[in-house]
Swiss-Prot record:
Keywords carried by this UniProt record: Ribonucleoprotein, Ribosomal protein, RNA-binding, rRNA-binding
Protein name as annotated: Large ribosomal subunit protein uL6
GO biological process: cytoplasmic translation
SUPFAM superfamilies cross-referenced by the UniProt entry: Ribosomal protein L6 (SSF56053)
MF terms in GO: rRNA binding; structural constituent of ribosome
Any one GO cellular component localisation term in the record: cytosolic large ribosomal subunit
Subunit structure: Part of the 50S ribosomal subunit.
Function: This protein binds to the 23S rRNA, and is important in its secondary structure. It is located near the subunit interface in the base of the L7/L12 stalk, and near the tRNA binding site of the peptidyltransferase center.
Organism lineage: Bacteria, Pseudomonadati, Pseudomonadota, Alphaproteobacteria, Hyphomicrobiales
Family of this protein: Belongs to the universal ribosomal protein uL6 family.
Gene label: rplF
InterPro entries assigned: Ribosomal_uL6-like, Ribosomal_uL6-like_a/b-dom_sf, Ribosomal_uL6_a/b-dom, Ribosomal_uL6_bac-type, Ribosomal_uL6_CS
Species of origin: Rhizobium etli (strain ATCC 51251 / DSM 11541 / JCM 21823 / NBRC 15573 / CFN 42)
Length: 177
């Protein structure tokens, strides 16, 4: 039995949730998101909470039970508060700037890298060495942050590159004579 899945997902104040078959839709102050559950999961809206239960006790249904509940909880948090991911840039001459809606990165290449964010994602650059990616979809925010980090990931000797703000880089010692 899933300890995560058996807890109903409370609908926070200020959010309207609707359940139509396998689809949960959440509308809140930040926008609207939906989640479509697998056919092996049943969804019900009871007492201002979404109850997630497996249709049968197969291994496949039980494995999707807790994940479905967590995804529904994630869309509620997204439309209420949103998600954000902070990135830091380390290195001499490495910096970020906004160019309209696009992000312009100087990362030591012969050219500047211009990143165009997808619809629903906003990027802010409070300092030239700090990038904040925000949006309502947790998966999309993480994907965009990973794509930006991928341009120049942190290297282990000096730590130069783009890294997550909460990431700890394991440093290596340089070669000795």
């Amino acid at each position: 039995m899933s300890r995560i899945g058996k807890k109903p997902v409370q609908v926070p104040a200020g959010i309207t949730a609707t359940v139509e078959g396998q689809k949960v839709t959440a509308k809140g102050p930040k926008g609207e998101l939906f989640f479509v559950a697998n056919d092996e999961i049943s969804l019900k809206l009871e007492n201002n909470a979404v109850v997630v239960t497996p249709v049968n006790q197969s291994k496949d249904a039980r494995s999707k039970w807790g994940m479905s509940r967590t995804m529904i909880e994630g869309i509620f948090k997204g439309v209420k508060d949103g998600y954000e991911r902070k990135l830091e840039i380390n290195g001499v001459g490495y910096r970020a700037a906004m160019q309209g809606k696009n992000l312009q990165l100087a990362l030591g290449f012969s050219h500047d890298v211009v990143y165009e964010p997808p619809v629903g994602i906003s990027i802010a650059v409070p300092k030239p060495t700090e990038i904040i990616v925000s949006g309502i979809n947790k998966q999309q925010v993480g994907q965009v942050a990973a794509e930006i980090r991928e341009y120049r990931g942190p290297e282990p000797y000096k730590g130069k590159g783009v890294k997550y703000a909460d990431e700890r880089i394991v440093r290596k010692e340089g070669k000795k004579k």
